[in-house]
Amino acid sequence: MRRILVIRWILAIHLIATQVFAERIKDIATLAGVRVNQLVGYGLVVGLSGTGDKTGTKFTEDSFANMLTQLGINIPPGVRLNSKNIAAVMVTANLSSFMKKGQTMDVNISSIGDSKSLLGGTLLLTPLKGADGRVYAMSQGNIVVSGISASGSDGSSVTVNVPSGGRIPNGATIEADIPNPFYYSNSLTYNLHTPDFTTAKRMSDAINELMGPGTAKAIDAGSVVVTAPKKLSQRVDYVSVLENIEFKPGEPMAKIIINARTGTVVISSNVIVKSAAVSHGNLVVSITETPVISQPNAFASGRTVATQQSQVNIQQKNNRAFILPKGTTLKDIVRGINAVGATPADVISILEALQQAGALSATLIVI
């Protein structure tokens, strides 16, 4: 059985090398379970030079008192702790799927109180938990801060970058492995980055052509299930072959994305316009405010005042029309719009009008 699999994989590699398609599976889909897992924890940073949380920050003082109690140091009732050299922080990290116990990873430190700077601080031992509440790593170490803040006695201050946050390179040690279906599942599921029925069908067909009929099955527009080898030792080679299979994805939907704030317009290459004529005029409205001094007569009882005299001009520029014949493509649209000297705002208006007229065969999305 193993010999048959090896021969099939060699044949698959040969076929992959002789075919030229648009995309590899690894570029348009991800293996279910192979992901980054977010970890978070609450901790204390000590060793700050008077830039920590201000005295009276209750959650910082309570956390500091609890930590001292756990270390066997009892705080007399009613005693308030000075927390100027201490800051309460949130610690975050990203744990990859295949990282193991004992390995280290970087962590980000962010102040949650009113600390001015974490420069020179040390994070005390902090557990990092996942979404399931389990502790997956422990973090501790000296913080690297890229920002700096300085203030004078008169209240003036200068801040460069963000001194209230920092990083600890290799500052967390992994204490537990993330459960991963790659090790125990009878099948492997690939999730498409952009769900599409045609792409899912073509992907499963490409896998079946190279790995054998019935190996892969598209279950919906976003997922393709592939039968996995029972032996774990064969799965790495198997996935290595799968993710390098190349095929031509389905054509995406015709879309036009408009950013109304910035005037950015993105048009996909398969946008088609039906026969239409476009005429777009520009109205230029200018309002000029001229200051006027009102000076009363010498013996009058009035007073000198400054007023504004407004002048409003409305000018309509000569508008030009252009015709979009049936089957017009992206290139023709851009050429026609540029020919009349349209601004980004004009382009948005023209595209919206074309869709309202039923001449635009695309989905118009305004963000």
UniProtKB/Swiss-Prot annotation:
Its main location: periplasm. GO terms for biological process: bacterial-type flagellum-dependent cell motility. Residues 1-22 form the signal peptide. The keyword Signal applies. GO terms for cellular component: bacterial-type flagellum basal body, distal rod, P ring; outer membrane-bounded periplasmic space. Keywords: Bacterial flagellum, Periplasm, Signal. Assembles around the rod to form the L-ring and probably protects the motor/basal body from shearing forces during rotation. The basal body constitutes a major portion of the flagellar organelle and consists of four rings (L,P,S, and M) mounted on a central rod. This is Flagellar P-ring protein. It comes from Legionella pneumophila (strain Paris). The lineage of its organism: Bacteria, Pseudomonadati, Pseudomonadota, Gammaproteobacteria, Legionellales. The gene is flgI.
